[in-house]
């Protein structure tokens, strides 16, 4: 079980959105590299980064900020947002990104996911962001007609490293992860599932280490860290104790 601190990039700055709304963005750090170093110093072992502008534009828009983070931290980085073709995937992996996250293209171009997962084993994840049960695309601005489970099942045998499941309705609101839906998804597929959206406090960490969440591969935490609602030392210690038990 991995706890991923999140850095969302908008105009080169670290921000947090509420329910995926770009007009409801709060800037938390003007220097993404400094934020990445801070998370590394706190003891986190894997960084989750999203290029929000890229998710809307369909191509990388915060490359300089991402590259600055890659230069200052040694921990692995998974990156999503605006990754829609094999050339972009290859470029990011070549620059030091450990794992890319394919979101919109997983819905619109499933062959890309399969080709990328085959070419780069263990380095391709799929991001499924759901609103009212349906997967949203294009930076959450548009809704599709397919469910997260339907998309996840498409890639069962593709060698995808992980499914990152986000409940958009909870994202950035600190009301707690939607563990029921995430655990249900994890129980239905063999691909590792990472929970995202709504992480609010140490109570979410306690819920993640319960036996019913044993199939989950991790969770992404954002605003709770920036707001100081989650003590990283306490959270990581709790997860380490659970792993050793």
Swiss-Prot record:
Keyword Amino-acid biosynthesis annotated: yes
Keywords: Amino-acid biosynthesis, Cytoplasm, Histidine biosynthesis, Isomerase
PANTHER family xrefs: 1-(5-PHOSPHORIBOSYL)-5-[(5-PHOSPHORIBOSYLAMINO)METHYLIDENEAMINO] IMIDAZOLE-4-CARBOXAMIDE ISOMERASE
Major location (coarse): cytoplasm
Pathway where it operates: Amino-acid biosynthesis; L-histidine biosynthesis; L-histidine from 5-phospho-alpha-D-ribose 1-diphosphate: step 4/9
Cellular component terms per the entry's GO annotation: cytoplasm
Name of the protein: 1-(5-phosphoribosyl)-5-[(5-phosphoribosylamino)methylideneamino] imidazole-4-carboxamide isomerase
Active site (catalytic residues): 8 (proton acceptor), 129 (proton donor)
Keyword field contains Amino-acid biosynthesis: yes
Alphabetical GO biological process terms: L-histidine biosynthetic process; L-tryptophan biosynthetic process
């Amino acid at each position: 079980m991995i706890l991923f601190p999140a850095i969302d990039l908008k105009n080169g700055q670290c921000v947090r959105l509420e329910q995926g709304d770009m007009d409801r963005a709060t800037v938390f750090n003007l220097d993404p590299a400094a934020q990445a170093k801070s998370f590394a110093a706190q003891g986190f072992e894997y960084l989750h980064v999203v290029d929000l502008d890229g998710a809307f534009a369909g191509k990388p828009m915060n490359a300089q900020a991402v590259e600055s983070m890659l230069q200052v931290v040694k921990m692995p980085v998974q990156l999503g947002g605006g990754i829609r073709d094999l050339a972009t995937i290859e470029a990011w992996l070549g620059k030091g990104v450990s794992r890319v996250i394919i979101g919109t293209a997983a819905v619109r171009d499933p062959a890309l996911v399969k080709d990328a997962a085959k070419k780069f084993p263990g380095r391709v994840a799929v991001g499924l962001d759901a609103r009212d049960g349906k997967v949203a695309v294009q930076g959450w601005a548009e809704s599709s007609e397919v469910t997260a489970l339907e998309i996840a099942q498409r890639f069962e045998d593709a060698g995808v490293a992980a499914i990152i499941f986000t409940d958009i309705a909870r994202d950035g609101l600190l009301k707690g992860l939607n563990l029921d839906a995430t655990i249900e998804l994890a129980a239905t597929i063999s691909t590792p599932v990472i929970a995202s959206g709504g992480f609010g406090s140490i109570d979410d960490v306690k819920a993640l280490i319960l036996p019913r969440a044993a199939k989950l591969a991790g969770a992404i935490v954002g605003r709770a860290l920036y707001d100081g609602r989650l003590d990283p030392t306490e959270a990581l210690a709790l997860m380490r104790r659970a792993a050793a038990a």
